[in-house]
Each structure stands twice: as structure tokens, then as C-alpha cells.
Amino acid sequence: MSAFTPASEVLLRHSDDFEQSRILFAGDLQDDLPARLDTATSRAHTQQFHHWQVLSRQMGDNARFSLVATADDVADCDTLIYYWPKNKPEAQFQLMNLLSLLPVGTDIFVVGENRSGVRSAEQMLADYAPLNKVDSARRCGLYFGRLEKQPVFDANKFWGEYSVDGLTVKTLPGVFSRDGLDVGSQLLLSTLTPHTKGKVLDVGCGAGVLSVAFARHSPKIRLTLCDVSAPAVEASRATLATNGVEGEVFASNVFSEVKGRFDMIISNPPFHDGMQTSLDAAQTLIRGAVRHLNSGGELRIVANAFLPYPDVLDETFGFHEVIAQTGRFKVYRAIMTRQAKKG
């Protein structure tokens, strides 16, 4: 996170305006501008664990990671700089949360790429902080307003759910496949063998659907789930609880917080981080899996067929198999053998 995003470059055009401000940065924080911009004070709140990791190294306790921001997270701030995400319900959750805590009179800046739909911020905040566009550059828009009325925020109203083969999946804004089971996960599930035993790690667990579906026909597996997203962690916990499935769920940047080894690692790894395409997480998953698999253990992932994972799998494990495929997706399997690099 050294190079600035287009949204941050637009903000830097106005850097003089922020020197005396006590700023809260929030939203899709893809770089470390919150730690580097010259301000009176800077705080940051993010729902993304990997963004918090970067910012906390420079900002310490002034960078916070959680699903819901608290009054302590926004204390003494007189300005909000909000980076618009690609997901509108996610923006609504975060902005209603933050504006319910910030005092009336707070300066509100919203910045984002045009393709992310940032212009819809005007309508979303019309009743609370009417916005005007103050800059347009780098295919981004920058909007400014002042908080006139605090919204009432209730996180419980943002929960959703759907059913998959008799299982109830709990979801929140910002969670992958929020409105239903995606085709890739469906293909991966079709390959899982009933009556599997052992320790299973679900990396990038989303709403937890892979784990609960696996546990239904393999009740003796011991589940661990992790994700970078605070909404995903909470959704997975709720999905497990609703379906009576036990498992440990926590935030982790791929393997950063994972301890121990497993008999199987499953994943539908992301290849987007916000608006940006990124293969980093999946490549880290493949290369790091050898440090978290028991001998004979298995990595099983689903991915878009066009993504360049076979080479990384072969380089790391010595070989791989394609055990299911459609026109769009492939399910890859790699086994932990003596051929595998030990990382």
C-alpha cells in the first residue's frame, strides 16, 4: 500500500484544506493516505482486516477494525473522509453507522471512482448531509457536505438470509454472495465427499455456506473459518449458529492469524479487492497452504477458469488435479506430499 489510489490522488489536490482538521477516514481504504496526510489528527475505521493491518502499523490505536464503529472510534473528529466502496448496501451500512455517531456540523467528504457508483452518495445522504460535487479527476468524484441531522442506525436491520438445500445462510452488506449461493461455490460443494473427517479450514469463508453445507453431510469434521471482512466473520458466526454447526470463526488476512495444521483447506478465493483486480490473496493461499496442511492433507479451491492458478499450484505442490469444471469455473485439488515446498 505505497502507491495512492485514484481516489486518494483526488483528495491530495485538496490537501491544504485538511491540515487543521481532525479527520476520520473510513470506507474502502485501499492505501495508507490516512496515515500520511498532513492533518491535526487522523483516525481510521475499517471493516477489512488487511487494511487495518497496514494502517495500524503506522497509526497504532488510531486505526480500528470492527463491523460497527463506536463513539470511541470517532471521538474528537470534526471531518469524515469516506471512500466509497463498490457495494452500495455496504456504503449505506457504514455511512449510517458513522453519521449516527459524528456530531451535527461535521464536514463530510465522500470520494470514489465513478464506476463504483459514488454519485449515488448524493441521494443516500440527502436527508442527513446534502452533498455537492467539488472535484472531478482521475475518473473519480469528490463530494462535500455538512452533517445536518444524525440518522438512527440499527445494525440488526441490515441482516438478510437465504436458504440453500434446507440450510439458512445469514448475510450482511459487503459479504460475498449476499443474495444467494454463487455458481463457483456450488461447483466446489458438489465435489465434497460425505463422511469426511478431520480438521477443515475454510479460508475467505464469506457467509459460511461452504462450511455448513460440508458439515451437514460430514458432521465429524472440525471447522475453522476465517475472512478479512468483519461482516463476513459475523455472518459466518450467525450462519453456523443458526444451523447448529460448531466452528471457530475469526478475522485473518489469509493465514496471518491461523495457527496449526489441517487435513483440508477449502476456499473460493477472491480476485477483487474493492474495485481493483488482485490475485494476491489466492496466490498467498496456495503458497501458504503447505505450512498449514498435514501430510496427505488437501487444498481444494474453486476459481474462474481463466485465472493463472495452475502454475502456482504446480510450483508449490509439484502437481495439481482439476476435479470438476464448467465453462467458467474449475475446482483444483492439490495434495500435501514430499514434493510440496515447505514454504
Curated annotation (Swiss-Prot):
It is found in: Cytoplasm. InterPro entries: DNA_methylase_N6_adenine_CS, Mtase_sm_N, rRNA_ssu_MeTfrase_C, RsmC/RlmG, SAM-dependent_MTases_sf, Small_mtfrase_dom. CDD domains: AdoMet_MTases. One of its GO terms (molecular function) is 16S rRNA (guanine(1207)-N(2))-methyltransferase activity. Its EC number is 2.1.1.172. It catalyses: guanosine(1207) in 16S rRNA + S-adenosyl-L-methionine = N(2)-methylguanosine(1207) in 16S rRNA + S-adenosyl-L-homocysteine + H(+). Keywords: Cytoplasm, Methyltransferase, rRNA processing, S-adenosyl-L-methionine, Transferase. Specifically methylates the guanine in position 1207 of 16S rRNA in the 30S particle. NCBIfam families: PRK09489.1 (NF007023). Monomer. Belongs to the methyltransferase superfamily. RsmC family. This is Ribosomal RNA small subunit methyltransferase C. It comes from Escherichia coli O6:K15:H31 (strain 536 / UPEC). The lineage of its organism: Bacteria, Pseudomonadati, Pseudomonadota, Gammaproteobacteria, Enterobacterales. The gene is rsmC.
